[in-house]
Each structure stands twice: as C-alpha cells, then as structure tokens.
Amino acid sequence: MSSDSGPLHRRTIPISVHIFSGFFYAPFYAPQLTQFIVTITMYSTYQRPAGYQPRQQPQGEEDRRPAHRRTVDHGSAFGKWHLDRLSGRTIQPANMRSEQSYIVDLLPPSAYTNINGSLRSTNPHITSVAATPAKFIQVALNKVRHPVYSATWTPDGRRLLTGSMSGEFTLWNGMTFNFESIMQAHESGVRSLKYSHSGEWLLSGDHEGNVKFWQPSLNCVNVIDKAHRESIRELAFAPSDHKFVTGSDDGLLKIWDFHESSNAESVLKGHGWDVKSVDWHSELGLIVSGSKDNLIKLWDPRSAKNVNTFHGFKNTVMKTTFQPTGTKRLLAAGCRDRTCRILDLRMLNSGSSEAGPTAGTDMPTRGDRSMAVLRGHDSDVFSLTWHPTHANVVTSGTKTGSIYTFNVDTTPAGGAYGPDSGILPVNTIPSAHDYCVSTLDYHPEGHVLCSGGLDRMTRFWARPRPGDPTSFRDKYYEPKEEGVSVKTLPGVNNATSRAGMARVEHVSTQHFNTAQPEVTDDEPVSIPGFAR
C-alpha cells in the first residue's frame, strides 16, 4: 500500500447473524432462535481533499448541550390509578405535600374528584397539586408568527388546534408539543373554534363573518358565507349537536340547523352593541351571551326570547361560559373591569324582556350568596375557562398576559359575599404572555393548560410535581421556615407533616420574573348554593 494514500482508519461494523440453536420435538414448542452479533473490523484508506482545514470550534460552543424537548406523558399516573382501583386502595389526597418523594403518588386530576366533580378532600392544597397549571412546559411558535386568536384540544386530547390572525390552522402534538401540520383555513383571522360534543365535527368562525364546517381530518365540507355582517366572536353547539349558535360584533346571535345551514333558523336580538361571547348549556335549554353593552343575557333557544338580563357590570363582558362538570348550574363571566363573576343559576330571580328594555336581574348586594366575585387581576379579563374535571376551578387570562387560577369554594376576602368582596386566586402566573391572553383551553383530562396570546405565541402549562422548585408559587406552596406551612394542610398531624419535608425554593425563569401578589391564607369553606 502506497504511503500517499492517507492514514489507515479503523471501522467496526456490527452484523446480526441468526442461528437456529436446536429443535424441540414437543408438539407445542417452536424452534428457538439465537442471535449473535459478529463484529467485523475493516481497514480503509481515506484521502483528505486538498486545502482541508479542520473546523474551528466557536468560543463557548463546548458548553452547549442538545436541546431537550419536554414531554408530558400521563400514562404512568393513569396506570397507577388503575392499579390502585383494582387493588381496592383508598385515595388519601391529604397526604400529598410539596416534597419530591410524593411524585410517585401523583394521580390524574380526575382521581381527586367525586362523581359530581367536587374534590374528595376539603384540603385546598389538593386543588393546587391536582388542578393548578403552575409549571411552564413549552412554547409553540409558527415559522411565520401571527397573533393566536383561538385554540382547542382535539376530543381525544392527542393534539391541539390553534387559529391565528392570518387564517391558518396549526396542529400541535399534545404530548411533545411540536409542530405537526399547518393549513390555510380562512382568508381572515380565525376568531373561534368549537368541536361538537360527539367529536365528529369542527366549526370555525372568522373575522369576516364566515363559518366553516370541518371533519376531524380537517377536510372542509361546508361554508356559510357572510353568516354575520361583522366578525364572529364565538360559536357553541347544542347538546344534541343538531344546532349551533353564533355571536357576532353586529350585535346579533343566530341559531343554525347543522344539516340545513343555508339560512339562520332564528335571530336573537336584544344587545345594543357587539356580542363578545356565547355559550349553549349542555343540559338546560339556555343560551348565554356577553356583550360590549355591559350586559349578560340568557335566551330560550326554542322561543328565541330573552329570559333574563344581568346588570351591574362596569365594562365589556368578554367571556361567558357555563360550568361543564359538577352540578352544571354555575355561570362564569369575565369582564374588562378586572373581575370575574360566578353566578348561581338556581338562586337568581327570573326576569323577562317583555317587561321592558330594562327588565332583568341586578347584581346581588353584599351578603347575597348567589354570586361570587373573583378579584386580584392586574388588568382586564379577556379569556376564561372552567377546569374539565374539577368543577370548582376557574382559570382566567388578562390583557397584560397574566394567568390566574381560582377555587370558587374558598372564603371571599372579608368573609362576606357580594360585589364588595372577592375570592383571591390560589395561583398566579405573572407575565405568562408578553401581551393579552386571547384564549385558554384545558386538556380533556385537565393536567395541561394551553394559552394563546396576541404576542404570537402558544404556551403550554402543566400542574407541578410535588416539590418542583421551578413552578410558580401559590399560597399553598409558599415556602416557610420548615417547608410548607402546616396550617395550609388541615387534618394532617403537625409532627408527621414536618418530617421529611424539604424547603421549597422558588427558581425564577428567564421570561417570568415578576413578583407575585401576596395572598392571604383563608380556611376553605363551601359557598351555600354552590354545593354539588
């Protein structure tokens, strides 16, 4: 071998060789297969090209590591829950504390609820552990960024679908949160996305007032051109999925037949300004709408008449949504007066639009327990959603990009109910987005929250693991001298609760370094009328 051919390079090639080791004469035995790995060492020559220069490593590159993609796999939690149910073990959520050794005991959010959706434990700390999205997971960005107007999880929870100002649908993986697909769905911004209760259809409404019908494969099968004169703000399906309602900035609500959608079946008139939100109750014959005229109206979809109007809001009502689980008799409303209100439909006086334009129900006075006010927001509330498995948990997003989680069963500040008091958040994520949080949606199992904002980002949040120092602190995770405050764990012996508890330090992330508002430690008390 000539010397100018270059240095010798050794290459090791593994080759799999399959050999039958023997046969068994028993009729039910098959031949066993033994696999051997044979390593062959080969030598080859390699001539470097003329002018070859070794790559210079940039300064500081040796410290770089491959990017780690976070994955949220809830299979282990469901597996443990299934085994516990088969073995007849009882769940004791009061034993869940902020210490890393309790990670193995973490169960799915639905494991901590009763049949009616209420928490099995009266310990508010369990709500924080099981249902509070306090851990940042991943940010999802399109190659060409546009404000995110709407987001919804697919019914199976495997993917997330977002709609942007450019009219694009973007499909994200629900476990690794990476990009999967993108398509041009509308010619203008996608303002609303809604899956049917059966999961077989998807409706989308855009900024120009058009409605499109989609199959789960995102195949468009029907279009209603100019369903409204102005932007469609929200859509909602009837419990049977045979009808749906749309709300628009033209001040009208329209009820459509899903199979005969050429013309609106009925038009609901009564709002004096833009309709910002609409929802159809999953059991009752009720439609709720919120408007820029500072009013909330309840409608009878059969007669297309207004059956009640709620006065007393100080600004635009941006979001109205019925309770999806539990008793399903609560109504949540987010307003641009920096508050949210929880209304109990069972304790409200009836009113009728036929009595005059001002007929309706005023906001309850102090001491009236038909309403609870959720306070503590740093700016106007633009988005609101209920937790899918915990009937007493509500999450809201504000204009400044913060996300708040409330437990409506806690005692209002001041110990009284009414518009002058308020329930404070159990967890706050300051500056979750750089600007307004335009949409919020929980995973069907409730362990992951998606938020979309006008900062052109989609972010994913999960409940923190016990003792996770990087999660955002709440009043139940607030570190004390010996770890978690014992008085936030009612029913747990002080001596045993202090044993083995590590001090939880709060580690700020690069994007979220705003100080969290101080929250008082109030003992949880169920609100009469909110009982499930």
From Swiss-Prot:
Q: What is this protein called?
A: Polyadenylation factor subunit 2
Q: Where in the cell is it found?
A: Nucleus
Which Gene Ontology terms of cellular component type are present? chromatin; mRNA cleavage and polyadenylation specificity factor complex
User: By its UniProt entry, which SUPFAM superfamilies does this protein fall under?
Assistant: WD40 repeat-like
Q: What GO biological process terms are annotated to this protein in UniProt?
A: chromosome segregation; co-transcriptional mRNA 3'-end processing, cleavage and polyadenylation pathway
Q: Which residue stretches does the UniProt record annotate as biased composition, category Basic and acidic residues?
A: 61-72
Gene that this sequence comes from = PFS2
Sorted keywords for this record are: Chromosome partition, mRNA processing, Nucleus, Repeat, WD repeat
Keyword Nucleus included in the entry's annotation: yes
Q: Which InterPro entries match?
A: G-protein_beta_WD-40_rep (IPR020472), Pfs2-like (IPR045245), WD40/YVTN_repeat-like_dom_sf (IPR015943), WD40_repeat_dom_sf (IPR036322), WD40_rpt (IPR001680)
- Residue ranges for the region (Disordered) are 50-72, 513-532
WD repeat segments run 143-182, 185-224, 227-266, 270-309, 312-353, 376-416, 432-471
The task this protein performs is described as: Required for 3'-end cleavage and polyadenylation of pre-mRNAs. Also involved in chromosome segregation where it has a role in chromosome attachment to the mitotic spindle.
Transmembrane segments annotated in the record for this chain: none
